[in-house]
Curated annotation (Swiss-Prot):
KW Coiled coil (keyword) present: no
Family per record: Belongs to the neurotoxin 10 (Hwtx-1) family. 04 (CcoTx1) subfamily.
GO molecular function, one term: toxin activity
Disulfide bonds listed in the record: C2-C17, C9-C22, C16-C29
Sites bearing Leucine amide, chain numbering: L33
Protein name listed in UniProt: Beta-theraphotoxin-Cm1b
Primary site of residence: secreted
Organism this protein belongs to: Ceratogyrus marshalli
Pfam families: Toxin_12
Keywords: Amidation, Calcium channel impairing toxin, Disulfide bond, Ion channel impairing toxin, Knottin, Neurotoxin, Secreted, Toxin, Voltage-gated calcium channel impairing toxin, Voltage-gated sodium channel impairing toxin
């Protein structure tokens, strides 16, 4: 299971879905281009 858009996440343990990345500043998954 992965985390989608605007889901809170841990930058050290990035479980965001494919094409998303965990923002270190905001601590939620952002779309990654």
């Amino acid at each position: 299971d992965c985390l989608g858009w605007f889901k809170s996440c841990d930058p050290k343990n990035d479980k965001c879905c494919k094409n998303y990345t965990c923002s270190r500043r905001d601590r939620w998954c952002k779309y990654y281009l």
